[in-house]
Amino acid sequence: MYAVFGLTRSEVTPHEAAAARYKHRGVIDRRGAAMTSRRAPDGGLNLDDFMRRQRGRHLDLPYPRGYTLFVCDVEETILTPRDVEYWKLLVVTQGQLRVIGTIGLANLFSWDRSVAGVAADGSVLCYEISRENFVVRAADSLPQLLERGLLHSYFEDVERAAQGRLRHGNRSGLRRDADGQVIRESACYVSRALLRHRVTPGKQEITDAMFEAGNVPSALLP
């Protein structure tokens, strides 16, 4: 089971208060609120339970106004499975990533919304498709995202990306402190990333299977 967060059942946390608020807003039912009781070391939602109960729903985010998290699997996003495998190679994910849906204004099409995933440390990352693709830290945890919305730094990082001021997320682009420890970046470019939309050259549709087989480039390979 993939669990990213944990406190004891008897503890009352802000996350459980947030779950109660979502229940009253019709987002989750009484059984859904119980998912905050099964926890792993960091305190928060059980990701498997969350995905099972919320899949296919738009969850309103407190900030910014009008933004939602649409809970879905990678198959309902613009990314291919191969794209996600290369996303996992970025240092910021620590080698582990679970796609949880898309984030953006509720009236946007799926391919115009950022793809959201949970990394090994529990943080929520957004994959942004642009002229040069990049990944941004959207929240320190999934419970924080649901309770407070996107980090204010998220929009600052998106602006930095537009200005060409991010570093690349591969190991050669890492910064280290005086002790040699990696300085974690809140946003980074995806090395050699290219914009990919599903297209039909001639009469042949480019499929996920073709990307996985390596016959044509994915969003993360030239």
UniProtKB/Swiss-Prot annotation:
Keywords: Activator, Host nucleus, Host-virus interaction, Ubl conjugation, Virion, Virion tegument. InterPro entries: US22-like (IPR003360). It holds the Pfam family US22. The keyword Cell membrane does not apply. Transmembrane segments: none annotated. It comes from the Viruses. It is found in: Virion tegument; Host nucleus. ISGylated; ISGylation regulates UL26 stability and inhibits its activities to suppress NF-kappa-B signaling. The keyword Magnesium does not apply. GO terms for cellular component: host cell nucleus; viral tegument. Belongs to the herpesviridae US22 family. Interacts with UL25. Interacts with ISGylation machinery components ISG15, UBA7 and HERC5; these interactions inhibit global protein ISGylation. Plays a role in the inhibition of host NF-kappa-B. This inhibition affects both the canonical and the non-canonical pathways. Blocks the induction of host IKK phosphorylation. May also influence the normal phosphorylation state of several tegument proteins including pp28 in virions. Also suppresses virus-induced ISGylation independent of its own ISGylation. This is Tegument protein UL26. It comes from Human cytomegalovirus (strain Merlin). The gene is UL26.
